[in-house]
Amino acid sequence: TYTLRDGLVWSDGQPVTAGDFAFAWQRAASPELAADYGYMFEVVDGYADMWATDDDGNFLNPDAQLNVVALDEKTLQVTTANYVAYWNELLAFPTYFPVREDVVSNDAWATDPSTYVCNGPYTMESWEHNSVITLVKNPNFYDANEITMETINFYLSDDANNMLSNFKNGDWELIDDVPTNEIT
């Protein structure tokens, strides 16, 4: 059972609720969404029932849900299928982050800065597709006074040579790929 801290709000000022977590987890684990990392909820009671199929691949329990309940606005109750020694590590993974139902009903909720709502330290200011995503400090973040970087730019590139060049000349501080010929 988890109790949310007081004063948590989304970047648009609405309160973060236990219901946001319950909705997000049910959504991420659902066969309908088939999220890439939805399997990470397999440790939560109810997941196996959600994904049980007959020999033809038809879901046996279309109404099954995770055993995750918002007891009130601030209290989330979670029942795992078994003891999970790495539970806290799972909770740190983005698949476990809350999302609001009214926000994700918009297809562009995660790709359009005008509809992007979050509760983390940064929010999306702009996204130039195939170029750069710019994040800015979220003034509504519960610990905003401790966030020292005002802006973060994520440069997007499929070209490992371009990435390495930008890293070497100091334009980029971090890259996630290097050209194969640079690996010894």
Give the location of each predicted region.
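Extracytoplasmic/secreted envelope proteins and their assembly/folding machinery
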Residues: 18-26, 65, 88, 121, ...
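Surface-exposed binding/hinge segments that line
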Residues: 3, 16, 20-22, 29, ...
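Extracellular/periplasmic solute-recognition and catalytic clefts
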Residues: 125-136, 153-184
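Local pocket/hinge segments that shape ligand/substrate recognition
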Residues: 34, 38, 146, 178-184
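Active-site-proximal beta-strand/loop segments in catalytic clefts of secreted hydrolases
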Residues: 4-5, 80-81, 138, 157, ...
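Gly/Pro-rich hinge or "lid" segments in bacterial periplasmic/extracellular proteins
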Residues: 54, 63-65, 73-74, 80-151, ...
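Short basic (Lys/Arg) and small-residue
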Residues: 8
